[in-house]
Amino acid sequence: MAVDLQELTANLVRFYDFKGKTVLFVGAGGRQLLDPSAGTRKLIAIDQDVESLQELKANIVARGWQNSMEVVASNFEDVRLSGDVVYFEFCLHEMNDPQKSLSHARTLAPDIVVYDHSPDSEWIFYGAEEDKVARSAAAMERFGIRSREAFHAEQRFQNHTELLARLAGQGDLAMQRAQRFAGATSIAIPMDYEVLLL
């Protein structure tokens, strides 16, 4: 996993002030870098992965965030809520049509924040996601970027088996590329990422 999730979170909240805002959080079913501790007025977690949302709901209850978080199981393009900001966390590149997703986001909130992989990140090569990331980066360029900041982290794995487990859902090409690390231990793969305000 990334070397320091706290650093990723700190970079996010330093880039954009979420305090007092209603945030439509797209892709919230995975691990969350943004939570109510950022001072949000309301955090609306949106994801279509029901299993991931069940885990998120349990986490919300365990942390006592029931009054500050709402969970919506939906395809993002079907969401008709409004807020101050739409926040995509490492998921815009997974959208079928990133341009359409950004256009829909603009109808829901005046600000759009995207936290995602940089097109030149080595990590996306091993995840076999370079085409998807390039497509979402091009969509953001066309949409109009107000500001951006680039960061560097590393994905670290104890061994090749742990790396393969992380890449399991990425397809055959990712598994083939990961063979470069067969037999290796203490694997570190550079992960460049960006936070953008659209």
Language-model regions, residue ranges each:
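Class I SAM-dependent methyltransferase SAM/SAH-binding core
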Residues: L24-D78
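Conserved class I S-adenosyl-L-methionine
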Residues: V113-R142
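Helix-to-beta-strand junctions that scaffold the AdoMet/dcAdoMet cofactor pocket
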Residues: W65, M95-N96, A109-P110
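Conserved Class I S-adenosyl-L-methionine
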Residues: A28-G30, K132-L198
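Local beta-strand N-terminus motif with an aromatic residue
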Residues: G20, S82-D84
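Conserved alpha-helix/loop element of class I SAM-dependent methyltransferases that forms part
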Residues: M1-K21, G30-D35
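A short SAM/SAH-binding and catalytic strip from SAM-dependent methyltransferases
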Residues: D84-Q99
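A short glycine-rich, Lys/Arg-flanked "PGG" loop and its adjoining helix->strand segment in the class I
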Residues: Q99-I112
